[in-house]
Regions:
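Short terminal or interdomain "cap/linker" segment that borders an active site or interface and mediates
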Residues: 118
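Short, extreme N-terminal segment that most often corresponds to the first beta-strand
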Residues: 1-24
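Hydrophobic beta-strand segments of well-ordered beta-sheets in folded domains
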Residues: 5-8, 66-67, 103
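A structural detector for beta-sheet-dominated domains
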Residues: 9-11, 47, 71, 106-108
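Short, flexible N-terminal segments of the mature chain
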Residues: 16-41
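Short, compact, well-ordered microdomains
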Residues: 72-115
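Short, intrinsically disordered low-complexity segments
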Residues: 35-79
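Glycine-rich, flexible loop segments associated with nucleotide phosphate handling
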Residues: 23-28, 62, 83, 87
Length: 118
């Protein structure tokens, strides 16, 4: 099916403070809050990486980067507009909890297939 994939990169995180466990809890807290008001839970995959930007950008960008990958599943949420609004609210909630760090978001059109467990 045709759908959208969002990638949310949050840069400049301090690995001595922000761990994978903390990132998971932060996303879950924001997603549960949005779900309570909209009925839409925004699932995400979390990957960690390291951003290297050298002297061209602000030095605090160097460091741990959290990459959340989100796929809109039209079978679960029919309205793209409603999903996008819920997604935006979750990302804003995550940013608030983390102290408004640098964030990049990409949105890609993709073909998405999945198989349920039998």
């Amino acid at each position: 099916m045709r759908t959208k994939r969002y990638t949310v990169a949050i840069a400049g995180l301090m690995p001595e403070i922000v761990t994978q466990s903390i990132l998971i809890k932060v996303w879950e807290k924001a997603a549960k809050k949005v779900c309570a008001s909209t009925g839409i839970y925004v699932n995400a995959w979390l990957n960690e990486s390291y951003f290297l930007c050298g002297d061209k950008r602000e030095p605090e960008l160097d460091g741990l980067t959290a990459n959340f990958i989100i796929i809109w599943n039209p079978v679960e949420v029919e309205s793209y507009e409603e999903f996008h609004e819920a997604f935006t609210q979750v990302v804003n909630g995550v940013r608030d909890i983390l102290g408004n760090p640098y964030v990049w978001i990409t949105i890609d059109d993709i073909e998405f297939y999945y198989f349920v467990k039998c």
